[in-house]
């Protein structure tokens, strides 16, 4: 019997659709995902349509799956003959997809509310939440951009962009942090009108 793998582009066949096809078809194999630079972004392992392993950098299991679900571009390679060194987990594919899509929607909403160039300043107060404490520790007494804080919060491998933005949002709502809009670039509205140059 000939066993054929599947290779393709994530912009044409999104990961959510690919996972659904693999799950519904009861497929077994290793799905390797590559980013735009053709570097390995992560690996998903399936046995009889069930997700039995997920890795993305230092993230594993559900967190790895959620991070990989955000890949909109890149390529994939599904190898049904690969030996599976699964993580000893059995992840419910359908509920992971539902939660993953919810998290993607929430990240988009948080990105609009907390754009990467926005400046974050400490106002005072504390928290006992470990990730919020990490955000505060990374911020320190000065000011940093949302993008810098999110990148700093991801160090350690147990958080993703959703977690970092959610922690920032919660700290802002508690009044511990203040998020200021990005400074307008020179020449934008707010300054005196510039004289027109005649040709």
Question: Language-model segments: which ranges?
Answer:
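Acidic, Ser/Thr/Pro-enriched low-complexity segments and adjacent helix/loop capping patches
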Residues: 1-199
């Amino acid at each position: 019997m000939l066993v054929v793998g599947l290779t393709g582009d994530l912009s044409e066949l999104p990961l959510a659709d690919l996972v659904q096809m693999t799950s519904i078809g009861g497929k077994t194999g290793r799905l390797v995902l590559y980013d735009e630079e053709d570097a390995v972004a992560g690996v998903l392992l399936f046995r009889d349509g069930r997700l039995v392993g997920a890795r993305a950098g230092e993230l594993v299991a559900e967190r790895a799956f959620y991070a990989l679900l955000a890949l909109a571009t890149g390529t994939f390679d599904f190898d049904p003959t690969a030996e599976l060194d699964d993580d000893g987990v059995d992840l419910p594919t359908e509920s992971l997809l539902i939660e993953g899509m919810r998290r993607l929607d929430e990240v988009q909403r948080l990105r609009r509310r907390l754009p990467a160039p926005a400046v974050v300043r400490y106002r005072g107060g504390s928290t006992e939440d470990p990730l919020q404490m990490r955000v505060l520790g990374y911020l320190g007494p000065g000011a940093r951009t949302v993008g810098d804080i999110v990148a700093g919060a991801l160090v350690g491998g147990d958080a993703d962009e959703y977690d970092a933005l959610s922690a920032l949002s919660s700290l802002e709502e508690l009044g511990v942090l203040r998020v200021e809009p990005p400074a307008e670039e020179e020449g934008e509205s707010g300054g005196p009108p510039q004289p027109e140059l005649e040709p």
